[in-house]
UniProtKB/Swiss-Prot annotation:
Keywords: Cytoplasm, NADP, Oxidoreductase, Queuosine biosynthesis. One of its GO terms (molecular function) is preQ1 synthase activity. The gene is queF. GO terms for cellular component: cytoplasm. NCBIfam families: QueF-II. Catalyzes the NADPH-dependent reduction of 7-cyano-7-deazaguanine (preQ0) to 7-aminomethyl-7-deazaguanine (preQ1). The active site is at residues 58, 65. It is found in: Cytoplasm. This is NADPH-dependent 7-cyano-7-deazaguanine reductase. It comes from the Bacteria. The keyword Oxidoreductase applies.
Length: 170
């Protein structure tokens, strides 16, 4: 018998996606992240998420900082569920941390959740005081191929290299 959907209802039962009431966390909340099984763990395929409205707080002034966050990853056995990722990123809005720390925290939390083959997180923060900050964090599994990818991407990184113009999204 052929399934109507690619996933059966048991696989989807525990996800927040589709709930009638969405609870938005008011503080940093890595516990809202959810993962699902990758149906193709033997493949090498990129997944990219673009968050165009990321907000956090400067830890010193408590002024808001705005950014675009780009997450590029190659999944292994688990993938991140997109609504949970949205809620997680939204949880930074009252979180006071420096740009570089926010990006590294996002990378570390996603590595802990999914254990991907490779992941990189790029933050393109709106300039304040005439200074633009574009932090980059990446991680690779121990496999030689992904370690080489890690080294290559890190050595070739430059602002805008692994992100995209928003005009391509809209």
């Amino acid at each position: 018998m052929k399934k109507k959907n690619g996933r059966d209802s048991k696989e989807l039962a525990d996800f927040a996606l589709g709930e009638s009431q969405t609870n938005y966390p008011e503080t940093y909340a890595p516990e809202v992240l959810e993962a699902f099984d990758n149906k193709n763990p033997g493949k090498i395929a990129w997944t990219t998420f673009v968050c165009t409205e990321f907000t956090s707080l400067c830890p010193k002034t408590r002024q808001p900082d705005f950014a675009k966050i780009f997450i590029n990853y190659i999944a292994d056995k688990k993938m991140v569920e997109s609504k949970s990722l949205k809620l997680y990123l939204f949880s930074f809005r009252n979180h006071g941390d420096f740009h570089e720390d926010c990006v590294q925290t996002i990378c570390d939390d996603l590595v802990k959740l999914m254990k991907p083959k490779y992941i990189e997180v790029i933050g393109e923060f709106t300039p304040r005081g005439g200074i633009a900050i574009y932090p980059y964090a990446n991680y690779a599994a121990k496999d030689k191929f992904f370690q080489e990818l890690y080294k290559k991407r890190m050595s070739e990184y430059a602002p805008g290299k692994y992100s995209m113009e928003l005009s391509k999204l809209y």
